[in-house]
Amino acid sequence: MKFKTGLVSLLVVCGACSQATKETDVVKDSFDFAGQQLKYAFTQIDSAKASMPEEQLKRKPVSPRTIEDNGALRLVASRDWTSGFFPGELWYMYEYTQDDFWKKQAQAFTANIEDQKTNGGTHDMGFKMYCSFGNGYRLTNDANYKNILLESAATLITRYKPTIGCIRSWDHSRDKWQCPVIIDNMMNLELLYWAFKETGDSVYYNIANTHARTTMKNHFRDNYSSYHVIDYDTITGDVLHKHTHQGYNHESAWSRGQAWGL
């Protein structure tokens, strides 16, 4: 009797586990929800532009970035560091669903930021171009996407400072820093490694490696937490300041920056 009771209990538990597994598909649920959110963004673009001041419209907003506290969709211009994230999300939706609806949307929003391929005033080339054109090229093998990516990589390395061994980040706040390099910049190196694989040009590989090693040396503390901003002397390459621009204080670990480094 005890054996039968135990066996029945085991079967009930196994059945419950099996049922729970069938009812929960985290990946599908996540993509379904993401699809709903992205489609909602499409419906809000026109109204968001209609409510924008003329000055904002002159900046040519093209990519949804977030929802404001008042429920309005926030759009950003191609020059914004997040402009490549939305088209990147659309490419992931296409990859998962194989639905041409998402492919067409991804192509349209990707094309909106092509002008950034020659923007030498930003270090965010990987964020913008590799998330968008990079995923597009990976999924379609479009030769035009490849050329745009290579031009983007060539633009990015113009910001490399050999004396320092890093790609310069921001150009603003010159009264505060000479040559700021932020931990976020690690995320842009993938574009350079890709360019090396595609072209065989070791310049891309060497710059990416040197930047990573310099960052490892100067951005990280003994406990492996990281600073957000390292400011370098443009002539000597020496470290001038170790700051945390968006974290709690200069000696804190800014969580988002810590993730960028990883």
Please annotate each region the language model reported.
Residues 1-25:
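Bacterial Sec-dependent N-terminal signal peptides
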Residues 21-262:
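Glycan-recognition and catalytic cores of secretory/periplasmic carbohydrate-active enzymes
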